[in-house]
Amino acid sequence: GKLKKATNYKVVDTNPAASKYSYVPGNNQILSANCGSLPPLTYTNVTYGGVLEVDDDSEGPIALPFTFCFYGTNYTDVYINSNGNITFGAGQTSFSSTGFPNGTDQMIAPFWADFDNGGGNGVAKISMGTDYMVVTWDSVGYFNEQGDKRNTCTVVITDGLSPILPVGNNVG
């Protein structure tokens, strides 16, 4: 697959009449964004150098079963990073996010934050088919093994034709 040459993507609420979301920073609110659903998948936990619970680490390169074109460059492998992103060409262990594009990271970041899944605070997991790769950071805590605020985020990349995504959601 290939990402469209756009810099802004937006989440479209499929039921705006039922939406009553308002966010006030620091209010300890729990928010949810549902951008579609995937079929049932079989996942494998990601280990970083054989270790499941890590802070600021990267695993890879992991071979993709297809060629993925990202901003005009073809990639056949990916790095899964513990802080909520995947990168191409090299791993990324920085816990502090930077602006995009920054010129050095070929990255897709569904939620780049200082995740720390130590102490049983969630896990990164992967599912791969012949035409897709799904990475989910599932119920991960934040820095210093904190478990009171957790995030789950997912990134899906495909060959551009995969039926794993609903019709119209593959870009190419």
Predicted regions and their residues:
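Von Willebrand factor type D
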Residues: 1-172
